[in-house]
């Protein structure tokens, strides 16, 4: 099958060097997986740097960098103004040798893909990766309105939408996307990199809780810090965010630091700053528990990566976490915003090493069996075949 992946940003090295939470890692890894399954894969991304070549190949995948506007990173508003050019360039490249299916990542790429395939009969499959609905609090009113309208348009026009979770499926149907046009295909995890066997970061005598730095306004870390006050034998490591030198000037992290000070736990809360992709599993293996209680997220890759490392997860009973974490088997689910309940569940887990070990073993097994890239790649191809 000739597969075209369309995205705003990706490079041939994204699978190993990009922001671990960015869409570039996911697109590059999916492309490599599809190529390993025997498909002809080309990734199309807007050229965002003068140093970027016209095309390059890596791991059996061809990456083409399409000129559309200035060869620089663009804000959402400026990018929208270049989508017509991006779409026209794609249409010209596909005129003589169209792909069997186009898979767009993020809503802006969906608009470009729909324009490029208009009247050709080539099906477009859409992965949003993130929807604007749970992020409205961090967008301007105008941005939220535009994004909501465009996501609805893309979702209702493409042949198939691949939702990351049951939570995203519900959001999509709320936008008016027909249920029959949606297939749940979660993000995959690299089970070679994220594995229980491997080095772990050094730690002291305290029990370690690991959480991710905020990716949105509704991150739930206030609840975790409040719960820490009732867990005197534990420490909280918040991994990721801006470079270490910028932690003291980051407004979100400083709000959390002030909350930790008021709660009397500032000596037990650590901010790592930006973490390389290779360092993430090292930190995950060092933790007794990975805590992720942002209940609105439609994509649950962070708990999945923790599970793959054999680390049990305490997650929110809402959002994508409910798909990933099997309550009582690979971790526990708690109601978002309840610090007392969170502290109680964490205390119970930390008091039972055998239970914690059993949860970790089951978590790693579930990550390997359900979320390996090989399985996710095959599920994605099945969706392509239904669309084509």
Enumerate the predicted regions with their spans.
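Aromatic "clamp/platform" in nucleotide-sugar-dependent glycosyltransferases that forms part
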Residues: 295
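Conserved acidic donor-binding segment of nucleotide-sugar-dependent glycosyltransferases
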Residues: 327-328, 332-339, 348-353
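Carbohydrate-associated surface elements
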Residues: 167, 188
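A short, well-ordered alpha-helix in the C-terminal region of glycosyltransferases
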Residues: 348, 355-370
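Conserved donor-binding/catalytic core segment of Leloir-type glycosyltransferases
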Residues: 201-219, 225-231, 237
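Short hydrophobic beta-strand element within catalytic cores of glycosyltransferases
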Residues: 312-316, 325
